[in-house]
């Protein structure tokens, strides 16, 4: 995987709307990183920093509060992982950096990136997530973890129970901040933040930063440095977006069955808006003798993990999911995303289709649109300054 899988051509075109004091560091060597961390970076497959890495890593390592906005597949996770690994002292077995993510899968993925990049540093990093054994969390945290990557509920719980000690924490990272700061997690984040030392550095990372999120960050960030991608750059380049007009909801299923052979050319993800719809569609597809797997937030964590693993390894080729999957989950082979339901929140559109064609691979997104959905589709087009065309007959050629 050359260059950690980042698409250089698309990366060079990203236009940053960034604080004036931010300098660009064209190589990892020029960032004054620890030798053991550099070894981990190169072993991971990175050769040179992506656009967001070349700007954000040094600012974060300097201790600046940072808002970094970059689209999926530009190396966002490695940006803050490298920064955390640079600032922690592995000789002190206490939690020094904390990452909060909106989903358990994302929290686990961040932990594995940290462990891989920190391979030569003897780093301890634990994924502290709901749906798993509390006893295991307590054992790991009592042993001492340099970095904790978790979901807000479980992290807040472990802090309250005094197993996650906060006095040495110097950095808090909010990943997929737009989702985290939506109503669901806002209270829990404030809860966690209250326990952190007053001088804790805050790093906010997300593909989309609506104004209300930026507004809220002022509450716990001091003079943040901003590294922002312009709004109209946000639809991933090289990604073909189509819609299929289905007169009514009932016709979506037949349309999906007609497309099934196309789906299995590579791997595909199908998004529905509710957990119930995911279960319904999965059952209906299986009744019609189609092989599909499915995942949503109601499932036990173990089951979600094994479904993810099967999908990552390519054992299952079509995954039906809710937006729990849409945020930051990196599966290389996905080159087709189907929005069986258009997302109810337009910010989620980019997170969903950002799965397909990650890292510059060709990707196709297909939206099923009933007459009631036309307005939502137009709204998405306007919001992202993009054009979504009617799907051509030869869609299979575009994917293969």
UniProtKB/Swiss-Prot annotation:
It holds the Pfam family DEAD. CDD domains: DEADc_EIF4AIII_DDX48, SF2_C_DEAD. Gene3D superfamilies: P-loop containing nucleotide triphosphate hydrolases (3.40.50.300). GO terms for biological process: mRNA splicing, via spliceosome; rRNA processing. InterPro entries: DEAD/DEAH_box_helicase_dom, Helicase_ATP-bd, Helicase_C-like, P-loop_NTPase, RNA-helicase_DEAD-box_CS, RNA_helicase_DEAD_Q_motif. A motif (Q motif) lies at residues 26-54. Keywords: ATP-binding, Helicase, Hydrolase, Nucleotide-binding, Nucleus, Ribosome biogenesis, RNA-binding, rRNA processing. GO terms for molecular function: ATP binding; ATP hydrolysis activity; mRNA binding; RNA helicase activity. A motif (DEAD box) lies at residues 175-178. Residues 238-399 form the Helicase C-terminal domain. Belongs to the DEAD box helicase family. DDX48/FAL1 subfamily. ATP-dependent RNA helicase involved in 40S ribosomal subunit biogenesis. Required for the processing and cleavage of 35S pre-rRNA at sites A0, A1, and A2, leading to mature 18S rRNA. This is ATP-dependent RNA helicase fal-1. It comes from Neurospora crassa (strain ATCC 24698 / 74-OR23-1A / CBS 708.71 / DSM 1257 / FGSC 987).
């Amino acid at each position: 995987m050359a260059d950690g899988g980042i698409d250089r051509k698309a990366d060079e075109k990203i236009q940053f709307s960034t604080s004036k004091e931010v300098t660009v560091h064209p190589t990892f060597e020029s960032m004054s990183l620890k030798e053991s961390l550099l070894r981990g970076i190169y072993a991971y497959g990175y050769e040179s920093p992506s656009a967001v890495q070349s700007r954000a890593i040094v600012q974060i390592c300097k201790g600046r509060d940072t808002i970094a906005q970059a689209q999926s597949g530009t190396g966002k996770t490695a940006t803050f992982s490298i920064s955390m690994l640079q600032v922690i002292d592995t000789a002190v077995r206490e939690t020094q950096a904390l990452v909060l993510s909106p989903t358990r899968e994302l929290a686990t993925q961040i932990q594995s990136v940290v462990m891989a990049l920190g391979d030569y540093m003897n780093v301890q990093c634990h994924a502290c997530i709901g749906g798993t054994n509390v006893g295991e969390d307590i054992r790991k945290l009592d042993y001492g973890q340099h970095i904790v990557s978790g979901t807000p509920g479980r992290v807040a719980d472990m802090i309250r129970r005094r197993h996650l000690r906060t006095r040495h924490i110097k950095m808090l990272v909010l990943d997929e901040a737009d989702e985290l700061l939506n109503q669901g997690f806002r209270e829990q984040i404030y809860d966690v933040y209250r326990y952190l030392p007053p001088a804790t550095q805050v790093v906010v990372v997300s593909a989309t930063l609506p104004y209300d999120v930026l507004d809220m960050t002022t509450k716990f960030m001091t003079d943040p440095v901003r590294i922002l991608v312009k709004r109209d750059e946000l639809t991933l380049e090289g990604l073909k977006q189509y819609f299929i007009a289905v007169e009514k909801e009932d016709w979506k299923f037949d349309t999906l069955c007609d497309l099934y052979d196309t789906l299995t050319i590579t791997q595909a993800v199908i998004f529905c808006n509710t957990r119930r719809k995911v279960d319904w569609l999965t059952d209906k597809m299986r009744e019609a003798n189609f092989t599909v797997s499915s995942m949503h937030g109601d499932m036990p964590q173990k089951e979600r993990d094994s479904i993810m693993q099967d999908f990552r390894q390519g054992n299952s080729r079509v995954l039906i999911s809710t937006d729990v999957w849409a945020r930051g989950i990196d599966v290389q082979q996905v080159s087709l995303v189907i929005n069986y339901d258009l997302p109810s929140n337009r910010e989620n559109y980019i997170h969903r289709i950002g799965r397909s064609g990650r890292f510059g691979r060709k990707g196709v997104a297909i939206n099923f649109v009933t007459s009631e959905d036309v307005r939502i589709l137009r709204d998405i087009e306007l919001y992202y300054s993009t054009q979504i065309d009617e799907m051509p007959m030869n869609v299979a050629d575009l994917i293969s």
